Amino acid sequence: MLEWRDEGALLSVRRHGESAAIIEVFTASHGRHLGVVRGGASRRHAPVLQPGAQLDLTWKARLDDHMGAFTVEPLRARTGIFGDRLALAGLNAICAMLHVVLPEREPHVGLWRESIELMDALAAPGWPAAYLRWEMRLLEEAGFGLDLTRCAVTGSREDLAFVSPRTGRAVGRAAAGDWADRLFPLPLALLGQGPASGPEVRQGLAITGHFLARELPLAGRPLPEARARLIDLLARG
């Protein structure tokens, strides 16, 4: 019998049979993982098995390639943001993006920590900029980090104004020349310079979305609707 214990955030839950549930969690040391919770569809478990809930998890299975079963204990609920439409959309986008980007059972310790911090930040103003930075980390985890440190043409670190939609590298204003209208404008929010305005966050998400959408279809997984709903709410202000 195989067994481990870990801490994780609940990404999704679906009914399994009459009384059980299959949950998907993002754990600190075991990555994105699925398992059955016996009695998970019961009234007792319903308040615990909510998106974003932080759980103490024990997983058991006979063989490593079996789905296995979880026993769960609540550590922290995030139901406090459920009355905030934008924050709830942010939480749903986080859970959905982790589902489509991360392979199963592959540890991403740094990303797990940053994901928990982002979920915590949803209760306070200003989190959309943190969400943008988190999507940049997702790109890194997917193997395609943006290089915004210097101009791809000249090597200069000054006056970076655009991002190439082909390479994900920054381009200086002067170096862009006649190609400027074919490049993404580079918002300062992506460079971590100054406060991030709503339009800058949306510009940044257009860039991260372009590269995430380009990379993910290779695995047959388009960007989730939850992300589109978040961007729509951000655009409405």
UniProtKB/Swiss-Prot annotation:
Gene3D superfamilies: Nucleic acid-binding proteins, Recombination protein O, C-terminal domain. One of its GO terms (biological process) is DNA recombination. InterPro entries: ARFGAP/RecO (IPR037278), DNA_rep/recomb_RecO_N (IPR022572), NA-bd_OB-fold (IPR012340), RecO (IPR003717), RecO_C (IPR042242). Pfam families: RecO_C, RecO_N. The keyword Ion transport does not apply. Keywords: DNA damage, DNA recombination, DNA repair. The keyword DNA damage applies. One of its GO terms (cellular component) is bacterial nucleoid. Involved in DNA repair and RecF pathway recombination. HAMAP family: RecO. NCBIfam families: reco. Belongs to the RecO family. This is DNA repair protein RecO. It comes from Cereibacter sphaeroides (strain ATCC 17025 / ATH 2.4.3) (Rhodobacter sphaeroides). The lineage of its organism: Bacteria, Pseudomonadati, Pseudomonadota, Alphaproteobacteria, Rhodobacterales.
